[in-house]
């Protein structure tokens, strides 16, 4: 791909084409990805988001990677849906330390009718603060999707996790077609899609390519594409899975950037295991979004002040959100992050 073709958005990628991207020399792949990235984004800006678990544990799904599944004994305590006021307090705290998007995740197969009114109030409250809103609640029906859109939800996260061919080896309680149907409902309701997957579950190169093909060949590319590295949790079937080669993970980010030029490619779960050099390579490969705070959904996430120190060393600045002048936004982050204290409510995006 030449620089002259970086504006092309495609929805017809083939396995042969994507496999060829994966296997080309590493430097060539990163050069191509960086060229595409610079055609669509400021290469020195990264979106920062905070993720809060609003309902933790006892999920009826059997996703083999997930510590929140009720099928496995991981020691995670079940928690009820958080009160709306507590969620809004955490959102205000996230905004104060620089997050421009607040994501709320619940360990559900799908939201119940009795929980929806509370969820809708959370969306309205966070929107009123001037933040972007994102939720991951499991499978949605059309009525629920339209209600969330009416409440003002900006983004809905629903990961495809892996390729259709490998999916049945990881999850049996929800079909791939159900996941695609939820994404269709979200798209039709006018919300933006956040969807990605996980590396390190025993998948092949073709499975990694197949996941990205599914995402890139959707009618519209996801606005955000979280790429997770498996966080191995004791008690889950994948606790002894083989580690992902760091260069293979960077290749995944780079190919995602090439296939979906205008999407935010999110460096998500597993970042705690990445050293600074690997994270810097990830940004060079086209990753331009991170979750930060103390934790994602159930696993450790690098401390936010460390993130900002790394940003400073790399000359990277957070994307400014609505209502934040760049200077004010940056100052708020740097001031508050040094004083940020641990919060047990921040939890791994891979389980979304």
Swiss-Prot record:
Gene it is expressed from: bioB
UniProt-listed PANTHER family: BIOTIN SYNTHASE (PTHR22976), BIOTIN SYNTHASE, MITOCHONDRIAL (PTHR22976:SF2)
Enzyme class: transferase
Residue numbers binding [4Fe-4S] cluster: 59, 63, 66
Source species of the chain: Pseudomonas savastanoi pv. phaseolicola (strain 1448A / Race 6) (Pseudomonas syringae pv. phaseolicola (strain 1448A / Race 6))
Name recorded for this polypeptide: Biotin synthase
Reactions mediated catalytically: (4R,5S)-dethiobiotin + (sulfur carrier)-SH + 2 reduced [2Fe-2S]-[ferredoxin] + 2 S-adenosyl-L-methionine = (sulfur carrier)-H + biotin + 2 5'-deoxyadenosine + 2 L-methionine + 2 oxidized [2Fe-2S]-[ferredoxin]
Record's subunit section: Homodimer.
Entry's cofactor comment: Binds 1 [4Fe-4S] cluster. The cluster is coordinated with 3 cysteines and an exchangeable S-adenosyl-L-methionine.
Function recorded in the entry: Catalyzes the conversion of dethiobiotin (DTB) to biotin by the insertion of a sulfur atom into dethiobiotin via a radical-based mechanism.
EC id: 2.8.1.6
């Amino acid at each position: 791909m030449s620089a002259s073709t970086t504006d092309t958005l495609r929805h017809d990628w083939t396995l042969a084409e994507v496999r060829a991207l994966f296997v080309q020399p590493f430097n060539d792949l990163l050069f191509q990805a960086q060229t595409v990235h610079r055609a669509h984004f400021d290469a020195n800006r990264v979106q920062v988001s905070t993720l809060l678990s609003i309902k933790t544990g006892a999920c009826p799904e059997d996703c083999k990677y997930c510590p929140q599944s009720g099928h496995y004994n991981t020691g995670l305590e079940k928690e009820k849906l958080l009160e709306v006021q507590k969620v809004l307090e955490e959102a205000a705290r996230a905004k104060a330390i620089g997050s421009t998007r607040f994501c709320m995740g619940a360990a559900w197969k799908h939201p119940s009718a009795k929980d929806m009114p509370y969820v809708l109030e959370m969306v309205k409250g966070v929107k009123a603060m001037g933040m972007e809103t994102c939720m991951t609640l499991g499978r949605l029906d059309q009525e629920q999707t339209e209600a969330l859109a009416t409440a003002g939800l900006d983004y809905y996260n629903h990961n495809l996790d892996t390729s259709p061919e490998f999916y049945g080896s990881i999850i049996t309680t929800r079909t791939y077609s159900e996941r695609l149907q939820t994404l269709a409902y979200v798209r039709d309701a006018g919300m933006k899609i956040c969807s990605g997957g996980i590396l390190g579950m025993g998948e092949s190169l073709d499975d990694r390519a197949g996941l990205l093909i599914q995402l890139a060949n959707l009618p519209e590319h996801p606005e955000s594409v979280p790429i997770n590295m498996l966080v191995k949790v004791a008690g889950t079937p994948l606790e002894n899975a083989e580690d992902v080669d760091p260069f293979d993970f960077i290749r995944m980010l780079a190919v995602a950037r090439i296939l979906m030029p205008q999407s935010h490619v999110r460096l998500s779960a597993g970042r705690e295991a990445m050293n600074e050099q690997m994270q810097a390579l990830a940004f060079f490969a086209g990753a331009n979004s991170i979750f930060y705070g103390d934790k994602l959904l159930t696993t450790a996430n690098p401390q936010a002040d460390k993130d900002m120190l790394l940003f400073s060393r790399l000359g990277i600045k957070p994307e400014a959100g609505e209502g934040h002048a760049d200077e004010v936004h940056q100052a708020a982050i740097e001031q508050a992050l040094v004083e940020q204290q641990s919060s047990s409510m921040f939890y791994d995006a891979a389980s979304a």
